[in-house]
Amino acid sequence: MAHEVVVVGGGIGGLTAAALLAARGVNVCLLEKESRGGGCAVTFERFGYTFEAGASLYASWQPEEIHARIFAELPVEQPEVRQAAPAYVVRLPDKTDVAVTGSVEEFAETLRAAFPECADAAVNFYREIAPVGEALRRIVRRVPDLRTASFSRRMRASLPEARVARRVLAALNHTAAQHLAKTSTRFRRFIDVQLQIFGQRESNECAYLYATVALMLPLWGMYAIRGGASGLADTLTEAIKKSGGSLRFNAPVLRLAYDEAGRALGVDLLSGERVEATRAVISNLTVWDTYGKLVGASRTPDNARRRIKDLGGWGAYLLYMGLDEEAAQRLPAEHLLTLTDWQEGQSFNPEGAQFMFGAAPEWDTRAPAGKRAVTVSTFTEAEQWFSYHEDESEHEEQDQRTLELWWERMHAIMPELGSGVEMIETASPRTFYSYTRRKLGMVGGIGQSPDVFGLNSLTHRTEIPNLFMVGDTVFPGQGVAGVTQSALIVANEIAPLSKG
């Protein structure tokens, strides 16, 4: 069977690319090994609860942002979203709560109260990043494919931002820490936990320009989606169907198929069937799995092999819980980003010090009456979950130890919970691997350090003719909004919208 475009993988990136192409009249077929779309963002049900697989906060749902741009093309309404107020609260080890919300000037008063030891430096840091982040946001609106756009297109997009252009150019290779010199350890850790959750790098490693956008996201507005990320995935699935696209679930792909010139001409399924693509194949796998599994080690170009050899990401260990409504009302926000240890005198290590507590919103509890679904997200080194074990009982013991550790930390930093929370289930990198087949179950993309950020990032293009990539390991990177933008970039390259 032949199509113009074949999409491998039904994560948010693959679904968005397929939905856009189908809406533009392209004969597209999406292949997904699971029974529904969503990838590592899919929700799951247990005992009357519907759990999200991550932090459950989503950026860029404002009218002029990426999601509105996508749904303006699609034959369906976007899922219901509501802004979280505040976006979240950062809770520090001394029990200081910092509500991240409001305009920069409104937030300045919050910073002064929370960080009196370096109030002016903290406020000045945010006043410094705000115009840079806003400028980068506007530039990417004008040129979504900034990473691969021509020099002239980049310049035209940047001209209206002349006031901050010099600052942007001067900071291209800076880390966020280089702009925190006069701040306290308390404030730096406040920044570290946010950069870690949004960019998988703390301030000493995170690209400054990435930080200017990431730290402004909650002030611009973060949103909850009805039904979680699966609400978005299901809506995109409906859009593909309405536009005449083909969806094939429970259809695992084995490898890429090539013509005599080495161009991608389709894919071979595990069943032995070949699905041909006359224009392009789009991989919604990670960059490691695109080359390691889809392309194949023997056909992976040397440049690509060298580039991805030392790239890595974090794994996630998640706790899925039920929360009494009475306990939920005692919390300062539905999302708490918590720091449990200052880790003074050492480099920041998120594995032992931070977690995100995310409760389903009151208007979409995803739980039995009087309850709310909760996902607690923590960082973990993925590889340790795949190291040699004598038998499965050792994995179970590792899971139990990790659960007990985070359960104790959670109750210590969030005493409001009391007995109003119960454990339902856990997930480790092994869980994510079993469902998504992502390398080592790593989720969240590649850490946004200067060497892999922006113009140094991996692009949607590959060295295999007719093969493209979407997802969180290519430009622009992390988050549902970033993945969605990567899909728009690929759709625009394969089937650009007519300017007429």
What residues fall within each predicted segment?
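N-terminal glycine-rich phosphate/pyrophosphate-binding loop and immediately adjacent elements
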Residues: 2-141
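Active-site/ligand-binding neighborhood in enzyme catalytic cores
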Residues: 130-243, 435-450
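A conserved beta-strand/loop element that lines the FAD pocket in flavoprotein oxidoreductases
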Residues: 240-253
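Mid-domain catalytic core of redox enzymes
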Residues: 252-369
